[in-house]
């Protein structure tokens, strides 16, 4: 296992700054995810680490070795691509063995390592099949086996589950986590899916327009987003404009606006215009209108999600609140809405676009 991977990288395409002074240190054995929307620079960062793109400026260090001057094949990294990138004319065995042949590994060692890796990814018995004879999930397992068989110092995964259906995504997500833990890998994963990031990662790097907005554990990103963009991206679908009116000794901040009075957490100044961010699952519906965070509204939309319903309510003030509930409210009914103060995060409004 490596000690640490550290880098500081920038990348420009003409006048466009795709990656702006992206600096990070990854510890050996860590699973780090670059999370962000399309075009945020996350895949560019991964390609720079892999050596598939040259940086405009910056350095990559693995322990005491500088890697950025080296070609991809001399960095010791394994790469899993979004589109699998399997060779259609090669069998499963030969696809997995390809990197070992490039490294001139002996035939006996190749056979042993390929069979062991196919067993790890549960593809025993499929050695002679071709990619066109495999399901999407099986093709992805071949791609993962090919990246792992070279015993990479770092495993890079570029949105590897995006082409799979929902059921297969869940299965392969669990498989990737199992392999990471079982083999003691150091992994860097790219995705736009917050669910993947939260379930797989030791740390998450949230990115936007080539910049890092927040780095933290899944719990820190989920519970304590630092900006409105991060909050919105990881599921805080309610962003209510309010003004800070008081700070309590208990650490909670009181804010009011749009007919709503809320209490929540946040490093915000008295009198500041802020956004009260809260997830739909932390909004409850009922008749009780006592205390901060309570208001009355009318149900405008109900969407069935299996065990629960997504409900959109227009408050008497005109503000719109989204809730997730096990109850079955009717469109047009009047309900009480309560925002859980312990789950509200108050964030500066200036970065909301």
Spell out what each predicted region is.
Residues 25, 61, 336-338:
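ABC ATPase nucleotide-binding domain
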Residues 31, 70-78, 82, 86-229:
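ABC ATPase nucleotide-binding domains
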Residues 35-37:
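The feature captures the beta-strand-to-loop junction immediately N-terminal to the Walker
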Residues 43-46, 142:
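ABC ATPase nucleotide-binding domain helices that frame the ATP-binding cleft
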Residues 50:
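Helix-to-loop junction immediately C-terminal to a conserved catalytic motif
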Residues 58-66:
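Conserved ABC transporter NBD signature motif
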Residues 237-239, 247-353:
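Non-catalytic connector elements of ABC transporters
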């Amino acid at each position: 296992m490596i000690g640490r991977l550290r880098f500081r990288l920038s990348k420009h395409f003409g006048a466009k700054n795709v990656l702006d002074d992206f600096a990070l240190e990854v510890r050996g054995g860590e699973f780090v995810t670059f999370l962000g929307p399309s075009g945020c620079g996350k895949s560019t960062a991964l390609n720079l680490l892999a050596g598939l793109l040259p940086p405009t400026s910056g350095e990559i260090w693995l322990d005491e070795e500088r890697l950025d001057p080296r070609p991809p094949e001399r960095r010791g990294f394994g790469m899993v691509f979004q589109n699998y990138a399997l060779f259609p004319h090669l069998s499963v065995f030969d696809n997995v063995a390809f990197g070992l042949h490039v490294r001139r590994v002996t035939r006996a060692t190749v056979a042993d390592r390929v069979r062991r890796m196919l067993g790890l990814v549960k593809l025993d018995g499929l050695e002679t099949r071709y990619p066109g004879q495999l399901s999407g999930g099986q093709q992805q397992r071949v791609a993962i086996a090919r990246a792992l068989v070279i015993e990479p110092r770092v495993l890079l995964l570029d949105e590897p589950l995006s082409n799979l259906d929902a059921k297969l995504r869940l299965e392969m997500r669990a498989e990737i986590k199992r392999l990471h833990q079982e083999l003691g890998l150091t992994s860097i994963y790219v995705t736009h899916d917050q669910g993947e990031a939260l379930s797989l990662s030791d740390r998450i790097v949230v990115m936007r327009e080539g910049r890092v907005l927040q780095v933290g554990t899944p719990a820190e990103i989920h519970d304590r987003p630092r900006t409105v963009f991060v909050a919105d991206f990881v599921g805080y679908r309610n962003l209510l404009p309010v003004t800070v009116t008081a700070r309590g000794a208990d650490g909670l901040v009181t804010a009011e606006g749009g007919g709503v009075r809320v209490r929540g957490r946040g490093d915000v100044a008295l009198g500041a215009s802020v956004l009260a961010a809260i997830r739909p699952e932390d909004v409850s519906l009922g008749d009780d209108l006592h205390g901060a965070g309570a208001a009355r509204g009318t149900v405008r939309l109900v969407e069935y999600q299996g065990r629960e319903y997504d409900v959109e309510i227009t408050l008497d003030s005109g503000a719109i609140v989204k809730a997730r509930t096990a109850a079955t409210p009717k469109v047009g009914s009047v309900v009480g809405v309560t925002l859980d103060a312990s789950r509200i995060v108050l964030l500066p409004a200036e970065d909301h676009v």
